[in-house]
Amino acid sequence: MIAWGGPKLAEAGATVIERSADDGAMGLSAISRIGAVRRHAAAIDRWCSQHRVAVHVPVDSPAANFPVAKRMKRRGVRVCHLVAPQLWAWGPWRLNKLRRCTDCVLCLLPFEEKWFRDRQVPARFIGHPVINRPLAEDTVARAAEYPAGSPKVLLLPGSRSSEVRRNLPLLLRALSEMQSRHRRLNALLVAANAELLQLVRSRIGDSVPSGLHLITGDLDAAIAWCDLALCVSGTVSLDVTRQAKPMVGVYKVSPLSYFGSRLLLTTPNRLLPNILAGRRIVPEFVPHMGGAEPVWQAAETLLADQARMRAATDALRGVLEPYRGHDPAEEAAQAILRLARGENPLSS
Protein backbone atom coordinates (compact mmCIF):
# COMPACT_ATOMS: atom_id res chain seq x y z
CA MET A 1 0.00 0.00 0.00
CA ILE A 2 1.51 3.28 -1.18
CA ALA A 3 0.16 6.59 0.08
CA TRP A 4 0.25 10.33 -0.13
CA GLY A 5 -0.91 11.23 3.36
CA GLY A 6 0.01 11.71 6.99
CA PRO A 7 1.45 9.84 9.98
CA LYS A 8 -1.66 7.75 10.65
CA LEU A 9 -1.36 6.13 7.24
CA ALA A 10 2.26 5.34 7.99
CA GLU A 11 1.27 3.85 11.37
CA ALA A 12 -1.30 1.67 9.57
CA GLY A 13 1.45 0.17 7.42
CA ALA A 14 1.40 2.29 4.27
CA THR A 15 4.58 3.46 2.60
CA VAL A 16 4.11 7.24 2.55
CA ILE A 17 5.77 8.67 -0.56
CA GLU A 18 5.00 12.27 0.30
CA ARG A 19 3.20 13.93 3.17
CA SER A 20 0.00 15.68 2.17
CA ALA A 21 -1.11 19.00 3.65
CA ASP A 22 -2.15 18.98 7.30
CA ASP A 23 -4.20 22.14 6.97
CA GLY A 24 -7.17 21.99 4.65
CA ALA A 25 -9.25 24.71 3.08
CA MET A 26 -12.98 25.28 3.02
CA GLY A 27 -15.07 27.19 0.51
CA LEU A 28 -13.49 29.89 -1.61
CA SER A 29 -10.30 29.81 0.46
CA ALA A 30 -9.47 26.59 -1.39
CA ILE A 31 -8.66 28.69 -4.46
CA SER A 32 -5.32 29.57 -2.86
CA ARG A 33 -4.39 25.87 -2.95
CA ILE A 34 -4.78 25.37 -6.72
CA GLY A 35 -1.03 25.49 -7.40
CA ALA A 36 -0.28 22.99 -4.63
CA VAL A 37 -3.03 20.66 -5.86
CA ARG A 38 -1.61 20.69 -9.38
CA ARG A 39 1.91 19.96 -8.15
CA HIS A 40 0.54 17.16 -5.99
CA ALA A 41 -1.32 15.58 -8.95
CA ALA A 42 1.73 15.84 -11.20
CA ALA A 43 3.97 14.17 -8.59
CA ILE A 44 1.56 11.25 -8.23
CA ASP A 45 1.30 10.91 -12.00
CA ARG A 46 5.09 10.77 -12.33
CA TRP A 47 5.26 8.04 -9.71
CA CYS A 48 2.51 6.04 -11.43
CA SER A 49 4.35 6.22 -14.76
CA GLN A 50 7.04 4.03 -13.17
CA HIS A 51 4.90 1.72 -11.03
CA ARG A 52 1.88 -0.48 -11.68
CA VAL A 53 -1.18 0.47 -9.61
CA ALA A 54 -4.02 -1.99 -9.00
CA VAL A 55 -6.52 0.29 -7.26
CA HIS A 56 -6.46 4.01 -6.49
CA VAL A 57 -8.39 5.08 -3.37
CA PRO A 58 -8.94 8.86 -3.23
CA VAL A 59 -10.22 10.01 0.16
CA ASP A 60 -12.53 13.04 0.39
CA SER A 61 -11.41 16.42 -1.10
CA PRO A 62 -12.73 16.31 -4.68
CA ALA A 63 -10.80 19.46 -5.63
CA ALA A 64 -7.53 17.66 -4.90
CA ASN A 65 -8.59 14.16 -5.91
CA PHE A 66 -10.56 14.55 -9.16
CA PRO A 67 -7.46 15.51 -11.20
CA VAL A 68 -5.54 12.54 -9.79
CA ALA A 69 -8.43 10.11 -10.33
CA LYS A 70 -8.82 11.33 -13.92
CA ARG A 71 -5.14 10.58 -14.63
CA MET A 72 -5.48 7.17 -12.98
CA LYS A 73 -8.42 6.21 -15.19
CA ARG A 74 -6.44 7.22 -18.27
CA ARG A 75 -3.79 4.72 -17.15
CA GLY A 76 -6.40 1.98 -16.78
CA VAL A 77 -6.32 2.00 -12.99
CA ARG A 78 -9.49 1.09 -11.09
CA VAL A 79 -10.67 3.90 -8.78
CA CYS A 80 -12.66 3.55 -5.54
CA HIS A 81 -13.66 6.82 -3.87
CA LEU A 82 -13.62 6.46 -0.09
CA VAL A 83 -15.81 9.25 1.34
CA ALA A 84 -18.27 10.47 -1.25
CA PRO A 85 -17.63 13.96 -2.64
CA GLN A 86 -20.46 16.10 -1.30
CA LEU A 87 -21.93 16.95 -4.69
CA TRP A 88 -25.41 16.85 -3.15
CA ALA A 89 -24.47 19.99 -1.16
CA TRP A 90 -22.65 21.85 -3.92
CA GLY A 91 -21.51 21.11 -7.43
CA PRO A 92 -24.10 18.59 -8.74
CA TRP A 93 -22.92 19.69 -12.20
CA ARG A 94 -19.69 17.78 -11.45
CA LEU A 95 -21.47 14.42 -11.57
CA ASN A 96 -20.32 13.74 -15.13
CA LYS A 97 -16.73 14.24 -14.02
CA LEU A 98 -17.22 11.82 -11.13
CA ARG A 99 -18.77 9.18 -13.42
CA ARG A 100 -15.74 9.37 -15.68
CA CYS A 101 -13.17 9.06 -12.90
CA THR A 102 -14.57 6.43 -10.53
CA ASP A 103 -15.58 2.77 -10.48
CA CYS A 104 -17.40 3.03 -7.16
CA VAL A 105 -18.08 5.44 -4.32
CA LEU A 106 -18.11 4.33 -0.67
CA CYS A 107 -20.44 6.60 1.29
CA LEU A 108 -20.28 7.60 4.94
CA LEU A 109 -23.72 9.22 5.10
CA PRO A 110 -26.82 6.96 4.77
CA PHE A 111 -28.72 8.99 2.16
CA GLU A 112 -25.74 9.27 -0.18
CA GLU A 113 -26.00 5.73 -1.57
CA LYS A 114 -29.44 6.35 -3.09
CA TRP A 115 -28.53 9.89 -4.17
CA PHE A 116 -25.56 8.70 -6.21
CA ARG A 117 -27.23 5.54 -7.53
CA ASP A 118 -30.20 7.59 -8.75
CA ARG A 119 -27.64 9.55 -10.79
CA GLN A 120 -25.93 6.46 -12.24
CA VAL A 121 -22.91 6.49 -9.94
CA PRO A 122 -22.15 3.07 -8.33
CA ALA A 123 -22.28 3.66 -4.57
CA ARG A 124 -22.63 1.91 -1.22
CA PHE A 125 -23.15 3.14 2.34
CA ILE A 126 -20.55 1.59 4.66
CA GLY A 127 -21.06 3.42 7.95
CA HIS A 128 -18.76 6.05 9.43
CA PRO A 129 -15.42 5.49 11.22
CA VAL A 130 -16.32 8.06 13.88
CA ILE A 131 -19.85 6.88 14.64
CA ASN A 132 -19.12 3.16 14.38
CA ARG A 133 -16.02 3.32 16.58
CA PRO A 134 -16.88 1.83 19.99
CA LEU A 135 -16.35 3.94 23.08
CA ALA A 136 -13.60 2.76 25.41
CA GLU A 137 -14.94 1.11 28.56
CA ASP A 138 -13.18 3.61 30.82
CA THR A 139 -14.53 6.71 29.03
CA VAL A 140 -17.02 7.62 31.77
CA ALA A 141 -14.42 6.97 34.49
CA ARG A 142 -11.97 9.33 32.78
CA ALA A 143 -14.72 11.93 32.41
CA ALA A 144 -15.27 11.87 36.18
CA GLU A 145 -11.71 13.13 36.67
CA TYR A 146 -12.51 16.46 35.03
CA PRO A 147 -13.69 19.47 37.10
CA ALA A 148 -17.23 19.52 38.43
CA GLY A 149 -19.54 22.35 37.51
CA SER A 150 -23.00 23.27 36.36
CA PRO A 151 -23.29 23.64 33.49
CA LYS A 152 -20.27 21.86 32.00
CA VAL A 153 -19.42 23.34 28.59
CA LEU A 154 -17.03 21.87 26.02
CA LEU A 155 -15.25 24.02 23.41
CA LEU A 156 -14.07 22.31 20.22
CA PRO A 157 -12.34 24.94 18.06
CA GLY A 158 -11.26 22.67 15.18
CA SER A 159 -8.60 20.22 14.07
CA ARG A 160 -6.71 22.59 11.76
CA SER A 161 -4.72 25.67 12.63
CA SER A 162 -6.76 27.84 10.25
CA GLU A 163 -10.00 26.73 11.94
CA VAL A 164 -8.62 27.46 15.40
CA ARG A 165 -7.45 30.94 14.39
CA ARG A 166 -10.86 31.82 12.96
CA ASN A 167 -13.12 30.22 15.54
CA LEU A 168 -11.30 30.44 18.88
CA PRO A 169 -12.03 34.15 19.52
CA LEU A 170 -15.72 33.61 18.74
CA LEU A 171 -16.00 30.61 21.07
CA LEU A 172 -14.18 32.43 23.87
CA ARG A 173 -16.52 35.43 23.60
CA ALA A 174 -19.53 33.11 23.70
CA LEU A 175 -18.09 31.35 26.75
CA SER A 176 -17.51 34.67 28.51
CA GLU A 177 -21.16 35.64 28.06
CA MET A 178 -22.28 32.26 29.38
CA GLN A 179 -19.96 32.52 32.40
CA SER A 180 -21.52 35.87 33.30
CA ARG A 181 -24.87 34.05 33.60
CA HIS A 182 -23.68 30.87 35.34
CA ARG A 183 -21.37 31.34 38.32
CA ARG A 184 -20.68 27.58 38.64
CA LEU A 185 -19.95 27.01 34.95
CA ASN A 186 -16.85 25.00 34.14
CA ALA A 187 -15.46 24.60 30.65
CA LEU A 188 -12.99 22.35 28.85
CA LEU A 189 -11.29 23.25 25.59
CA VAL A 190 -9.94 20.23 23.74
CA ALA A 191 -7.13 20.81 21.25
CA ALA A 192 -6.74 18.06 18.66
CA ASN A 193 -2.97 17.78 19.22
CA ALA A 194 -0.06 19.37 21.09
CA GLU A 195 0.70 21.78 18.26
CA LEU A 196 -2.84 23.15 18.29
CA LEU A 197 -2.80 23.37 22.09
CA GLN A 198 0.28 25.56 21.78
CA LEU A 199 -1.55 27.70 19.21
CA VAL A 200 -4.52 28.05 21.57
CA ARG A 201 -2.24 29.08 24.45
CA SER A 202 -0.47 31.62 22.26
CA ARG A 203 -3.81 33.12 21.21
CA ILE A 204 -5.16 33.31 24.75
CA GLY A 205 -1.89 34.49 26.29
CA ASP A 206 -1.53 34.63 30.05
CA SER A 207 -5.18 35.48 30.62
CA VAL A 208 -6.85 32.05 30.46
CA PRO A 209 -10.46 32.70 31.54
CA SER A 210 -11.34 31.48 35.01
CA GLY A 211 -13.14 28.15 34.82
CA LEU A 212 -11.63 27.22 31.44
CA HIS A 213 -9.32 24.20 31.35
CA LEU A 214 -7.15 23.47 28.31
CA ILE A 215 -6.38 19.87 27.39
CA THR A 216 -5.24 17.88 24.38
CA GLY A 217 -6.65 14.55 23.24
CA ASP A 218 -9.12 12.44 25.26
CA LEU A 219 -12.00 13.83 23.20
CA ASP A 220 -14.40 11.01 24.08
CA ALA A 221 -14.02 11.56 27.82
CA ALA A 222 -14.44 15.32 27.40
CA ILE A 223 -17.67 14.80 25.47
CA ALA A 224 -18.93 12.34 28.10
CA TRP A 225 -18.15 14.99 30.75
CA CYS A 226 -20.00 17.91 29.18
CA ASP A 227 -23.62 19.02 29.27
CA LEU A 228 -23.29 21.06 26.08
CA ALA A 229 -20.67 21.47 23.36
CA LEU A 230 -19.79 24.51 21.27
CA CYS A 231 -18.13 22.94 18.26
CA VAL A 232 -16.73 23.88 14.89
CA SER A 233 -18.56 22.36 11.94
CA GLY A 234 -16.90 19.18 10.70
CA THR A 235 -16.28 15.60 11.73
CA VAL A 236 -16.02 16.56 15.40
CA SER A 237 -19.77 17.25 15.37
CA LEU A 238 -20.18 13.50 14.72
CA ASP A 239 -18.00 12.72 17.75
CA VAL A 240 -20.48 14.74 19.80
CA THR A 241 -23.44 13.12 18.01
CA ARG A 242 -22.10 9.64 18.82
CA GLN A 243 -22.68 10.37 22.52
CA ALA A 244 -25.93 12.26 21.78
CA LYS A 245 -24.80 15.41 23.58
CA PRO A 246 -26.59 18.71 22.82
CA MET A 247 -24.42 21.15 20.89
CA VAL A 248 -24.24 24.40 18.95
CA GLY A 249 -22.31 24.31 15.67
CA VAL A 250 -20.39 27.22 14.16
CA TYR A 251 -17.87 27.89 11.40
CA LYS A 252 -16.42 31.40 11.19
CA VAL A 253 -15.45 32.50 7.68
CA SER A 254 -14.40 35.64 5.82
CA PRO A 255 -17.08 37.81 4.15
CA LEU A 256 -15.94 36.56 0.73
CA SER A 257 -16.28 32.91 1.76
CA TYR A 258 -19.60 33.64 3.46
CA PHE A 259 -21.28 35.11 0.40
CA GLY A 260 -19.60 32.60 -1.90
CA SER A 261 -20.92 29.73 0.22
CA ARG A 262 -24.40 31.21 0.11
CA LEU A 263 -24.25 31.07 -3.67
CA LEU A 264 -22.69 27.61 -4.01
CA LEU A 265 -24.29 25.53 -1.26
CA THR A 266 -27.65 24.04 -2.18
CA THR A 267 -28.67 22.51 1.17
CA PRO A 268 -30.45 24.37 4.01
CA ASN A 269 -28.32 22.60 6.65
CA ARG A 270 -24.51 22.44 6.71
CA LEU A 271 -23.79 20.83 10.10
CA LEU A 272 -23.46 17.04 9.76
CA PRO A 273 -26.02 15.97 12.40
CA ASN A 274 -28.60 18.26 10.77
CA ILE A 275 -27.75 16.90 7.32
CA LEU A 276 -28.18 13.35 8.63
CA ALA A 277 -31.47 14.18 10.33
CA GLY A 278 -32.80 16.03 7.29
CA ARG A 279 -33.90 18.85 9.59
CA ARG A 280 -32.50 21.36 12.08
CA ILE A 281 -31.98 19.38 15.30
CA VAL A 282 -28.85 21.33 16.32
CA PRO A 283 -28.51 25.15 16.26
CA GLU A 284 -25.95 25.91 13.56
CA PHE A 285 -24.18 29.02 12.32
CA VAL A 286 -22.42 27.59 9.28
CA PRO A 287 -21.02 29.59 7.61
CA HIS A 288 -20.91 32.52 10.04
CA MET A 289 -19.32 35.94 9.78
CA GLY A 290 -21.07 37.68 12.66
CA GLY A 291 -20.33 37.95 16.36
CA ALA A 292 -20.75 35.62 19.31
CA GLU A 293 -24.23 36.75 20.35
CA PRO A 294 -26.32 34.25 18.36
CA VAL A 295 -24.00 31.43 19.41
CA TRP A 296 -24.25 31.98 23.16
CA GLN A 297 -27.96 32.80 22.91
CA ALA A 298 -28.59 29.45 21.19
CA ALA A 299 -26.60 27.72 23.92
CA GLU A 300 -28.52 29.53 26.66
CA THR A 301 -31.85 28.59 25.06
CA LEU A 302 -30.88 24.94 25.37
CA LEU A 303 -29.43 25.15 28.88
CA ALA A 304 -32.47 27.01 30.20
CA ASP A 305 -34.91 24.28 29.15
CA GLN A 306 -34.32 20.65 30.14
CA ALA A 307 -37.10 19.54 27.80
CA ARG A 308 -35.16 21.06 24.89
CA MET A 309 -31.98 19.34 26.08
CA ARG A 310 -33.76 15.96 26.23
CA ALA A 311 -35.32 16.52 22.80
CA ALA A 312 -31.89 17.30 21.34
CA THR A 313 -30.46 14.12 22.87
CA ASP A 314 -33.33 12.01 21.52
CA ALA A 315 -32.99 13.51 18.03
CA LEU A 316 -29.25 12.82 17.97
CA ARG A 317 -29.84 9.21 19.03
CA GLY A 318 -32.23 8.86 16.10
CA VAL A 319 -29.49 10.00 13.72
CA LEU A 320 -27.34 7.06 14.87
CA GLU A 321 -29.85 4.32 13.97
CA PRO A 322 -28.85 3.79 10.28
CA TYR A 323 -25.25 3.16 11.39
CA ARG A 324 -26.00 0.15 13.56
CA GLY A 325 -24.44 -3.07 12.29
CA HIS A 326 -21.90 -1.40 9.99
CA ASP A 327 -18.13 -1.88 10.09
CA PRO A 328 -16.75 0.80 7.75
CA ALA A 329 -13.15 -0.43 7.77
CA GLU A 330 -14.11 -4.02 6.94
CA GLU A 331 -16.71 -3.01 4.34
CA ALA A 332 -14.31 -0.59 2.63
CA ALA A 333 -11.49 -3.15 2.62
CA GLN A 334 -13.69 -5.82 1.05
CA ALA A 335 -14.93 -3.45 -1.66
CA ILE A 336 -11.37 -2.38 -2.54
CA LEU A 337 -10.13 -5.99 -2.63
CA ARG A 338 -13.01 -7.04 -4.88
CA LEU A 339 -12.19 -4.17 -7.22
CA ALA A 340 -8.52 -5.21 -7.27
CA ARG A 341 -9.59 -8.73 -8.33
CA GLY A 342 -11.73 -7.32 -11.13
CA GLU A 343 -14.98 -8.20 -9.35
CA ASN A 344 -18.03 -6.05 -8.64
CA PRO A 345 -16.89 -3.95 -5.65
CA LEU A 346 -20.46 -3.43 -4.44
CA SER A 347 -21.53 -7.08 -4.36
CA SER A 348 -22.16 -8.60 -0.93
Spans of model-derived segments:
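Nucleotide-activated sugar donor-binding and catalytic core shared by glycosyltransferases
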Residues: 1-348
